[in-house]
UniProtKB/Swiss-Prot annotation:
Organism: Shigella sonnei (strain Ss046)
Cofactor(s) needed: Mg(2+)
Keyword tRNA processing among UniProt keywords: no
Membership in a protein family: Belongs to the Thz kinase family.
CDD domains xref list: THZ_kinase
This protein's UniProt keywords: ATP-binding, Kinase, Magnesium, Metal-binding, Nucleotide-binding, Thiamine biosynthesis, Transferase
A GO molecular-function annotation: ATP binding
Gene that specifies this protein: thiM
Keyword Kinase: yes
Protein name: Hydroxyethylthiazole kinase
Residues reported to bind ATP: 125, 171
NCBIfam families: PRK09355.1, thiM
Reaction(s) the record says it catalyses: 5-(2-hydroxyethyl)-4-methylthiazole + ATP = 4-methyl-5-(2-phosphooxyethyl)-thiazole + ADP + H(+)
Length: 262
């Protein structure tokens, strides 16, 4: 399958839509990244909510623009809440995104994620090892880290997209986004981004938000990858290391939104 490149005009248009619609994103994400995820969404113009109680999660999934399920710090009570939210999201036609953190390394979360696939996610975002494991092609990964190149996971991503109907995102040095029939590659970013906890998880939240936008969902999701890579490049150019990267990254996201509104 041919891999196309995302145009800057497409990315800018999607960011304009993002800011215009300001999606309300229900983030059921892991404990490590909640603040960074919320700030990333806010910097781009979305509205985050971290609702995790089972009864509330189901109720909130019905009114949110989009739902994120991130299994990074999965527990049985949290799985129950996530299951309830996903069931309600399907019933309410709220698009939801799955981030199958470390699914290739741990059996419980792999079985849980496979169970959730029956509720038809709008998008799935993971690294190469996670996507390959979720597709049933291989089990691997070094905990939350990938042991495979993103390009090697393209066939698995295409298979997973066709089987689930989801837009599948494989992140790495180059990000690949596919619906099983089309594929888009997004270059850029910086290796320093992999040294900061939460950049991938935050991207999953932005992907979830983009699934609520009108227009071409594949292009909107690919645009999310582009914004994050652009912001990462700008932040690395301005920072002196990991400690100063995060505030510069959030500034860069905010500045991107201001540029498309100008």
């Amino acid at each position: 399958m041919q891999v196309d490149l995302l145009g800057s005009a497409q990315s800018a248009h999607a960011l304009h839509l993002f800011h215009q619609h300001s999606p309300l994103v229900h983030c059921m994400t892991n404990d490590v990244v909640q603040t960074f995820t919320a700030n990333t969404l806010l910097a781009l113009g979305a509205s985050p909510a971290m609702v995790i109680e089972t009864e509330e999660a189901s109720q909130f999934a019905a009114i949110a623009s989009a739902l994120l399920i991130n299994v990074g710090t999965l527990t049985q009570p949290r799985a129950q809440a996530m299951r309830a939210a996903v069931e309600q999201a399907k019933s309410s036609q709220t698009p939801w995104t799955l981030d199958p953190v470390a699914v290739g390394a741990l059996d419980y979360r792999r079985h849980f994620c496979h169970e959730l696939l029956s509720f038809k996610p709008a998008a799935i975002r993971g690294n190469a090892s996670e996507i390959m494991a979720l597709a049933g092609i291989a089990n691997g990964g070094r905990g939350v880290d990938t042991t495979d190149a993103a390009a090697n996971a393209i066939p698995a991503a295409q298979t997973l997209a066709r089987e689930t109907g989801a837009i599948v995102v494989v992140t790495g040095e180059v990000d690949y986004v596919t619906d099983g029939h089309r594929a888009v590659g997004i270059h850029g970013g910086d290796p320093l981004m992999t040294k900061v906890v939460g950049t991938g998880c935050a991207l999953s939240a932005v992907v979830a938000a983009c699934c609520a936008l009108p227009g071409d969902t594949l292009e909107n999701v690919a645009s999310a990858c582009h914004w994050m890579k652009q912001a990462g490049e700008r932040a690395v150019a301005r920072s002196e290391g990991l400690g100063s990267f995060v505030p510069h990254f959030l500034d860069a996201l905010w500045q991107l939104t201001q540029e498309v509104q100008a």
